[in-house]
């Protein structure tokens, strides 16, 4: 890293001027840099932190940010820290305050302080689930049960992989807990804040807890008027706006099961999910508004031959489509329960293992896995938010997502169960209106996926907006890019990016960053609380703990909130069959390639089936893509696949690419191929060679934004 940049003690004022900074400002900034280098050296983490705090700002050229970051860490090695926790500020975080109060009780003589004792506490959370989860769920998050569980964890059948029973005997309703008044939430607290695209100069819309409760109760009564059997499935297929959140909570509150369907899905994909879930009704919208476009949604639901639909207008009160016989409008649906307006709805308390939500994995071939969330899964989602993202009362959380995949429900529970506000922008997150919404809503945690950040950096649409209220960013969904996330941190005065890696079947994350640890870009600093990771060697057995290495990831089978069933598959075969045993327990399959670096950070290298063998060297697509994405400024993004030649032999490396300007006809494919070769041979391995480059208008992606390399491998013959 940073080999092409000067070390900081060699930087002079003219280097600032060469980046377009005026001579007067350059002299001032160089003076500050010289003072920092004198006090902290030219290449230490403290040097960088002082540069981030006292020199850099969002309005300075990003090339200056790069020069100083990469120059500071020129010879550092893997995973240099981009953010370091402040020992005093840590004490006010959720985990820091807990450890200050009870650290010695939990860890005894091992406890020193929240920062140096964090890894010991993570291990404690795995070894002592009874203490850890009781503390977090009951004492800290104030989760209430109508019938208390007999214990936190029962392990009657140790020979049954993943067969642990969490909170046995307990009854609760996770939606009711979102609406409860407790020390984290008061009736006049703002719980949802939102704005519609196009209304970017209008005041924000807000719902207090009192108002949210009344809306959810009314929908709960209206659901009961439909006469559906308790426990049946009801689908939601619409953008994630305030009504969608109200409907989601009401379905769970009333004892039904949400079926999550993304609003981007085609009619066949909608039909598949309705069939697998056996949904009895569906909430949807007539159209989706994106800028000046109206994208039909209800017509896709009709084409999917859905059960009865309740249809919400995308704007105003009139539905912009003719309804099928048996379908009803949102207004009529609510009108049937008008006599119960403002009346409290009695939540249906359920056993912990009762289903609340059916979600679907983003499969690239075949039928998607139908994964049920129970009443426990929302608690896992919220606990990750509490411990790793430090979500708490007074926070404002925005994450561009949809109830059709796991980050939608995750956002609902991680915010509301921790007393934070959900911030919703009803429109595209790729426009300046979204950046203004982040500013106006005073967002404290901004969730992203890397492709959104790439677009922001490319278009500079966030320029000029004040993001100083942000305490952290969070990222999930796909591997991120160091340079792009350095740029992102710079938009909010170098607040940390807390990376998270998990899955729908986990209900949250198994690896993440933490406010109690130094954060490195595109890295995970820890195993999640209550989780254990294992990296398998080439023979399929776990490597020694804390030994640096790379291989397929396996998970400890005892994970709070993780799935135990699939509606359309054999859960044991998918997650446990053929996995190694450690200490008498069969490990759980995940399928990612993970790396543990020499300084203790985890890196994700994509799916195990996204690795290739180039010249006898096994490497992940993501490692190749990270290099290729930086080769040519005209290239927006790339993806790499290995293709065996006809007749057999070593895999050939093929790079698909998308241009920033789709109308650019000046690109020379052979020259680009040579540029990719040069970059790969310089940064990865001198034996790597790109055989073909293929232009595309866009990369095929799943609904959760993962690149479908498998599809490209299948389609490559067409390019031939």
Curated annotation (Swiss-Prot):
- A cellular component annotation (GO) from this entry: cytosol
Where found, per UniProt? Cytoplasm, Cytosol; Membrane
Activity control note: Inhibitied by high CoA concentrations.
Keywords, alphabetical: ATP-binding, Cytoplasm, Fatty acid metabolism, Ligase, Lipid metabolism, Magnesium, Membrane, Nucleotide-binding, Transmembrane, Transmembrane helix
* Entry's Gene Ontology BP terms: cannabinoid biosynthetic process; fatty acid metabolic process; fatty-acyl-CoA biosynthetic process; terpenoid biosynthetic process
Record's bilayer topology term: Single-pass membrane protein
* InterPro entries, per database record: AMP-bd_C_sf (IPR045851), AMP-binding_CS (IPR020845), AMP-dep_synth/lig_dom (IPR000873), ANL_N_sf (IPR042099)
Q: In which tissues is it expressed?
A: Accumulates in glandular trichomes, especially in female flowers. Present at low levels in roots, stems and leaves.
Report whether Transmembrane shows up as a keyword of the record: yes
List residues traversing the bilayer: 242-262
Which transformation does this protein catalyse, written as a reaction?
Answer: hexanoate + ATP + CoA = hexanoyl-CoA + AMP + diphosphate
User: Could you say which residues are annotated as the site Hinge residue important for conformational flexibility?
Assistant: 609
Q: What is its EC number?
A: 6.2.1.-
Keyword flag Magnesium: yes
Cofactor(s) recorded for this entry are: Mg(2+)
Q: Where does CoA bind?
A: 290-293, 615, 681
Gene Ontology MF terms: ATP binding; CoA-ligase activity
Residues the entry annotates as binding ATP: 477-479, 499-504, 585, 607, 618
UniProt protein name: Hexanoyl-CoA synthase
Source gene? Answer: AAE1
């Amino acid at each position: 890293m940073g080999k092409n940049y000067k070390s900081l003690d060699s930087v002079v004022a003219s280097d600032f001027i060469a980046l377009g900074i005026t001579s007067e400002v350059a002299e001032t900034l160089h003076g500050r840099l010289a003072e920092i280098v004198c006090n902290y050296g030219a290449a230490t983490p403290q040097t960088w932190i002082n540069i981030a705090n006292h020199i850099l700002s969002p309005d300075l050229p990003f090339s200056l940010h790069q020069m100083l970051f990469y120059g500071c860490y020129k010879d550092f090695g893997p995973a240099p820290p981009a953010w370091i926790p402040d020992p005093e500020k840590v004490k006010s975080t959720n985990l820091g305050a807990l450890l200050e109060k009870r650290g010695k009780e939990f860890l005894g003589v091992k406890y020193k302080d929240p920062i140096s004792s964090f890894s010991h506490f993570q291990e404690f959370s795995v070894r002592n689930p009874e203490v850890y989860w009781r503390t977090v769920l009951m004492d800290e998050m104030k989760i209430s049960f109508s019938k208390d569980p007999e214990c936190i964890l029962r392990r009657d059948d140790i020979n049954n992989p993943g067969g642990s029973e969490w909170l046995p005997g307990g009854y609760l309703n996770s939606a009711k807990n979102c609406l409860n008044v407790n020390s984290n939430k008061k009736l006049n607290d703002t719980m949802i804040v939102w704005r519609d695209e196009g209304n970017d100069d209008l005041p924000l819309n807000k719902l207090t807890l009192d108002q949210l409760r009344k809306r959810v109760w009314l929908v709960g009564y209206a659901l009961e008027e439909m006469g559906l059997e308790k426990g049946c499935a009801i689908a939601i297929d619409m953008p994630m706006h305030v009504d969608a959140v109200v409907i989601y909570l009401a379905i769970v509150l009333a004892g039904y099961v949400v079926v999550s369907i993304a609003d981007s899905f085609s009619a066949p994909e909608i039909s598949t999910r309705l069939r697998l879930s056996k949904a009895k009704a569906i909430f949807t919208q007539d159209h989706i508004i994106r800028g000046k476009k109206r994208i039909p949604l209800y017509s896709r639901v009709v084409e999917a031959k859905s059960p009865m639909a309740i249809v919400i207008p995308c704007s105003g009160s009139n539905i912009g489509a003719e309804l099928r016989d048996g379908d009803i409008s949102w207004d009529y649906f609510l009108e049937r329960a008008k006599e119960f307006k403002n009346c409290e709805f009695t939540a249906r308390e359920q056993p912990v293992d009762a289903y609340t939500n059916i979600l679907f994995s983003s499969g690239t071939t075949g039928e998607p896995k139908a994964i049920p969330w129970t009443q426990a899964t929302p608690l896992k989602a919220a606990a990750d938010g509490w411990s790793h993202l430090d979500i708490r009362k007074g926070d404002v959380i925005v994450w561009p997502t949809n109830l059709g995949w796991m980050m939608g429900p995750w956002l609902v529970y991680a915010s509301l169960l921790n007393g934070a506000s959900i911030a919703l922008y009803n429109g595209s997150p790729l426009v300046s209106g979204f950046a203004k919404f982040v500013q106006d809503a005073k967002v404290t945690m901004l969730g992203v996926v890397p492709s959104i950040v790439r677009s922001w950096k490319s278009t500079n649409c966030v320029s000029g907006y004040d993001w100083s209220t942000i305490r952290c960013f969070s990222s999930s969904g796909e591997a991120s890019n160091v340079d792009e996330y350095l740029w992102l941190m710079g938009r909010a005065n170098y607040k940390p990016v807390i990376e998270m890696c998990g899955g729908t079947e986990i209900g949250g994350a198994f690896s993440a960053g933490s406010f109690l640890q130094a954060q490195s870009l595109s890295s995970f600093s820890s195993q999640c609380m209550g989780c254990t990771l294992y990296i398998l060697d080439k023979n399929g057995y776990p490597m020694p703990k804390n030994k640096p290495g790379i291989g397929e990831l396996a998970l400890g089978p005892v994970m709070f909130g993780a799935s135990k069933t699939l509606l359309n598959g054999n859960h044991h075969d998918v997650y446990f069959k053929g996995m190694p045993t450690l200490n008498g327990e069969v490990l759980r399959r995940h399928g990612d390639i993970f790396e543990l670096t020499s300084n203790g950070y985890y890196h994700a290298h994509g799916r195990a089936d996204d690795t290739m063998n180039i010249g006898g060297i096994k490497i992940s697509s993501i490692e190749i893509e990270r290099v290729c994405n930086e080769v040519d400024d005209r290239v927006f993004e790339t993806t790499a696949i290995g293709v065996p030649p006809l007749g057999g032999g070593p895999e050939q490396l093929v790079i698909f690419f998308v241009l920033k300007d789709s109308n650019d006809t000046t690109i020379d494919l052979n020259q680009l191929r040579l540029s990719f070769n040069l970059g790969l041979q310089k940064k990865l391995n001198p034996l790597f060679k790109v055989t073909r480059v293929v232009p595309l208008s866009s990369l095929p992606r799943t609904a959760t934004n993962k690149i479908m390399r498998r599809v490209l491998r299948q389609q490559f013959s067409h390019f031939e």
